C-alpha cells in the first residue's frame, strides 16, 4: 500500500459532527476514512443592532445608544458599547437604562435592515463553507474542517472573515476558534469587542480550569448559585465533581457539565433546522399580587419577547403564557392566530387576554413567561439536530 495516499478532494463523510476526509489507496483501489480534529469558528457581531444604526447614521457614532422602544415600559434590545460602560444591557427596562445613562439616545430600530445585513454577513461565511449554523441574526457557527478555499488554519479563515466584514460591511465581529462548539463560543466572548481568540487543544484544559462557572455555556444564575453553594466557582472546581454527583444535582444538565469541564462537546454544526420557539420568563424577588403590577410585567415581558423574536428572526403563530404561583403550582394558556405574530399591536392584546384572572383570589405569582411557537414554515431536521434545544435545559439569563 502506498504510504502517501492521495486525498480525494470533495469526498468526505460526517460522523458525529466530525469531518472525515476519504483517502484513496492507489495500490488496492480502496477508500478509507481519515478522522481529523474539527475546526469550529463561532462568529458574533459586536452590538449588532446598535452598530448598524451607528454605521448608517454618522451622528450616532461614538455615542451611547440603545435600540428599543422609548416608552415607560420599553426594553433595551441592544446597547452600544458606549452605553454598556454605564451598565446598560439588553433586556433591561428602558427607564432603568436612562437612569444609568442620562444622555442615552434611544433608537426605534430598523429590523428589516438588520435582517438584510445579517444575510450579507452569511454570504461572506458561505465563501468558506456550507456548514453554517445561524443562531440568530448576529451569530453563527462555522465548521471549516474541510473548507472551500483549502485554507489549512481555521484562525486564518477567522481573520479573513473579520477583515471582510470590516471592509465590506463597515462593522466589526468577534471570533472564537477551537475544536468544538462549546469552546469556540467561549472564545468569541473572551476578547469582545472586535476580538479573536483561539483555544488550542493542548491548552484547552488549563483554559477551562480558569473559567468562572458563570462563563460556562448553559449555566444561568440559578445553576451558578447552586454550584456556588457547594463550593464550585471555577472550571477546575467543577472538574472535581463526578458525573454521577452532577447528574444527581442537575439531572440531564449534569453529564453535560461534566463533559464541558473536560473540553468535550460532540455536537455537530447543523445547517438545516428551524427554531421551534422564542420565549422569555422572569422569576420575581417578591411575589406579585397587585393586578396593576402584573399588568406591568406582562407588558414588559411582551417588549422583551419582541426583542428576542427579532434577534432570532423568528415568526410564530401561537402565544403561550406560563404562570408559576408561590405554592409552585403552574398553569399555561395558549392562543393561536392564522398569521405570524410579529408586532406589539398583535402580541400585547393576546397576552393581556391570556392573563385575565391569573391572580384570582389574590393568588401570589412567582413567575411569568411568554413564548412564541408554531413557526410559519417547517424545515426538516436531521436526526439528532438541535441537541442543545432538545436536551440541554438552558436558563433564561
Task: State where each predicted segment sits.
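Gly/Gly-Pro- and Ser/Thr-rich, intrinsically disordered tail segments characteristic of DNA damage-repair
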Residues: 9-249, 254-256, 372, 376-397
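DNA-contacting surface of Y-family translesion DNA polymerases
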Residues: 34, 42, 215, 223-367, ...
Amino acid at each position: 500500500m502506498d504510504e502517501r495516499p492521495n486525498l480525494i478532494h470533495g469526498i468526505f463523510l460526517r460522523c458525529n459532527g466530525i469531518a472525515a476526509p476519504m483517502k484513496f489507496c492507489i495500490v488496492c483501489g480502496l477508500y478509507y476514512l481519515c478522522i481529523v480534529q474539527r475546526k469550529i469558528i463561532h462568529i458574533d457581531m459586536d452590538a449588532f443592532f446598535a452598530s448598524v444604526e451607528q454605521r448608517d447614521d454618522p451622528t450616532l457614532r461614538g455615542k451611547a445608544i440603545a435600540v428599543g422602544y422609548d416608552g415607560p415600559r420599553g426594553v433595551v434590545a441592544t446597547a452600544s458599547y458606549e452605553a454598556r460602560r454605564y451598565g446598560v444591557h439588553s433586556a433591561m427596562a428602558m427607564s432603568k437604562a436612562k437612569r444609568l445613562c442620562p444622555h442615552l439616545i434611544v433608537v426605534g430600530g430598523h429590523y428589516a435592515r438588520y435582517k438584510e445585513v445579517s444575510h450579507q454577513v452569511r454570504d461572506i461565511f458561505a465563501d468558506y463553507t456550507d456548514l453554517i449554523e445561524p443562531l440568530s441574526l448576529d451569530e453563527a457557527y462555522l465548521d471549516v474542517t474541510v473548507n472551500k478555499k483549502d485554507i489549512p488554519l481555521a484562525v486564518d479563515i477567522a481573520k479573513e472573515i473579520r477583515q471582510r466584514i470590516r471592509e465590506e460591511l463597515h462593522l466589526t465581529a468577534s471570533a472564537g476558534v477551537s475544536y468544538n462548539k462549546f469552546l469556540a463560543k467561549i472564545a468569541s466572548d473572551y476578547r469582545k469587542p472586535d476580538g479573536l481568540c483561539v483555544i488550542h487543544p493542548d491548552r484547552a484544559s488549563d483554559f477551562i480550569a480558569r473559567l468562572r462557572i458563570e462563563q460556562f455555556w448553559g449555566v444561568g444564575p440559578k445553576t451558578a448559585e447552586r454550584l456556588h453553594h457547594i463550593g464550585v466557582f471555577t472550571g477546575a472546581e467543577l472538574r472535581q465533581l463526578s458525573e454521577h454527583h452532577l447528574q444527581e444535582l442537575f439531572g440531564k444538565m449534569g453529564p453535560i457539565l461534566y463533559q464541558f469541564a473536560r473540553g468535550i462537546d460532540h455536537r455537530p454544526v447543523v445547517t438545516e433546522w428551524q427554531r421551534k420557539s422564542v420565549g422569555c420568563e422572569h422569576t420575581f424577588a417578591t411575589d406579585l399580587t397587585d393586578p396593576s403590577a402584573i399588568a406591568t410585567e406582562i407588558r414588559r415581558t411582551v417588549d422583551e419577547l419582541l426583542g428576542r423574536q427579532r434577534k432570532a428572526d423568528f415568526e410564530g403563530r401561537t402565544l403561550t403564557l406560563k404562570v408559576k404561583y408561590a405554592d409552585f403550582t403552574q398553569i399555561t394558556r395558549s392562543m393561536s392566530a392564522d398569521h405570524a405574530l410579529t408586532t406589539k399591536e398583535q402580541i400585547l392584546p393576546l397576552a393581556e387576554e391570556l392573563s385575565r384572572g391569573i391572580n384570582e383570589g389574590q393568588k401570589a405569582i412567582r413567575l411569568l413567561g411568554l413564548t412564541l411557537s408554531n413557526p410559519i414554515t417547517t424545515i426538516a431536521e436531521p436526526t439528532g439536530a438541535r441537541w442543545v434545544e432538545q436536551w440541554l435545559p438552558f436558563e433564561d439569563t
